[in-house]
Amino acid sequence: MARKNFVREKRIYCGKEWLEVDIVPVTNMPEAGKTKGKGSSQKQQNLNDKNSKRRFVQIANTNFNEEDLHISATYNEAHLPMTLEEAEKNVHNYLNRVKRRMKRVTGQDLKYMLVTEYTPEEEEGQLTLEGLEDTGTKAVRIHHHIIINGGLSREDLELMWSTTRINWKKAQDPKYRREVDFIGFVNCDRLQPNENGIEGLVNYINKRKKGCKKWSTSQNLKKPKIKKNDHKYSFRKLREYAQTPEDKEIWRKRYKGYEPTKIDYQYNDYTGWSVYLRLRKVRD
């Protein structure tokens, strides 16, 4: 007979360095899954956004580290796309150029995560230029954030955000570079993961509340590995741990070889306490 009420541990291994853990009550109470009132749809949207962002961080931490790169690519007036579809075509043409160059120079396959940020009107084919709207807030001018594996120089990656067919024999000549027809401003930096991995960059990408974001990845990224255990924790133990929410030693003992970097307790009137953990592998 299936257990009616229990505490589930879900481990999410993000590569060799990162581990996320959800410890959540699972109950058969119908009230636990209900949302009431006017704000229920907005609450669900907020939850969906939170889960999408978290999934992005998990995939990024699984596949990228400080040897890899972040590219910000924008559009100038001469090359401003009129639709989201056109912008997506532009950025995928760019990624194809990078893919070919990377294979030729390093022998590696390109790995990437792409975020395109835009205003909702662009989905309908009506571009909203950067400027003041009726709300008095700035519209989001369409642009891209790309995380890619290392191997090519930052200068060459920036050079390829252009309509010019690059002559690589002249590519190091400053005069040649000045004559390149850039699509817009482009900047490439090395990733700088902190104690929470790449989450800081994701927060930067998501800093604007206004506007929409569409993200996609290359097909060759590794997926986080998930393991579930319904017998490791009890409701009583979870209540005990919640009394000392800042105590990291509990989790060091529970997950040996890992250092907790984030601990987040949540309380629900129907199901009780749950906890989310992010841990980093202790380096020798």
Write out the residue ranges for each language-model feature.
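Right-hand nucleic-acid polymerase module
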Residues: 1-140, 150-284
